[in-house]
Amino acid sequence: MPLIIRIWALLEKINNMAFSKEEIAQRIAKEIKDGFYVNLGIGIPTLVANYIPKGINVVLQSENGLLGMGPFPFEGEEDADLINAGKQTITTLPGSSIFDSAMSFGMIRAQKVDLTILGAMEVSEHGDIANWKIPGKMVKGMGGAMDLVASAKNIIVAMQHVNKAGESKLLAKCTLPLTGVNCIKKIVTELAVLDVLPEGGFKLLERAPGVSVEFIRQSTAGKLIVEGEIPEMKLD
């Protein structure tokens, strides 16, 4: 069998083992504690609203001006006047509050949010994040991520481990314009759960079922730290 076909077959096998975007969100939801106020960024983070563990009281914030965001609506039950920061239709929970974005960012800058979950294009081994611009591509603006990374107490990144070209997004140093520096604490990808250590480096905590540590190592351009046996990621 030609080498290129063997490589393609291996990648297909890994893709089948790796977590979906929904499963990434479900794994991140396990990090949420009772009583938390949580900001959900655009992309994969918005899916977390569908997987809040039962039995805990959590208030989800959307930066466009909402406290008490619920899961996505069922088909046919959408209300076009209720959207999140990513312009997706949402639901609200009893006791929810709607207000202007100035008040929303006042909450963020005053560090009233316990946990922020963001998407990213790149994260460095020192916790730097790039998630707002790819040079040469038109963007409407920076968005709210820079306020969040400057003010949040705890930030988890939900992202794909590699880009569409198969290049790692977990780097020694970010190549894209930065959103914030030394601010990311944890990363969840389709392949792994990793801590970003204060001294630098990605510490591997969990791996997707069927995905080897060696494959994660090959998919990580920054410093990967592996200690002992690495358990598989669990969703329940």
Question: Which stretches of residues belong to each language-model region?
Answer:
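N-terminal active-site beta-alpha-beta segment that forms phosphate/nucleotide-binding
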Residues: 17-93
